[in-house]
Amino acid sequence: MSKFFRRRKFCKFTAEGVKEIDYKDLNTLRQYLTENGKIVPSRVTGTKSKYQRQLATAVKRARFLALIPYTDNHDI
């Protein structure tokens, strides 16, 4: 057996009973973005595939409406 035990990942949206992810909820969306603005994969976050698809769509809508930047690191 391994020396270290990892905590089991769980879907936060399933636990809270979320029906649909809202693109206007920026605090929730930012939890699933890296500091560069990329969407964190579900194998890292533990999000179910249904909610990962909704999350990706919500992030893309928020980016298009300029609620979230496409990238945070701009080298000048």
Swiss-Prot record:
Keywords, ordered alphabetically: Ribonucleoprotein, Ribosomal protein, RNA-binding, rRNA-binding
**InterPro entries listed in its UniProt record:** Ribosomal_bS18, Ribosomal_bS18_CS, Ribosomal_bS18_sf
The biological processes this protein is annotated with in GO are: translation
Cellular component, GO annotation: cytosolic small ribosomal subunit
Entry keyword annotation includes Secreted: no
Q: Do you know which Pfam families this protein is assigned to?
A: Ribosomal_S18
User: What GO molecular functions are on record for this protein?
Assistant: small ribosomal subunit rRNA binding; structural constituent of ribosome
Q: Which domain of life is it from?
A: Bacteria
Query: How does this chain assemble?
Result: Part of the 30S ribosomal subunit. Forms a tight heterodimer with protein bS6.
Assigned protein family: Belongs to the bacterial ribosomal protein bS18 family.
Role this protein plays: Binds as a heterodimer with protein bS6 to the central domain of the 16S rRNA, where it helps stabilize the platform of the 30S subunit.
What NCBIfam families would the database entry show? S18 (TIGR00165)
Name of this chain's protein: Small ribosomal subunit protein bS18
| Species | Stenotrophomonas maltophilia (strain R551-3)
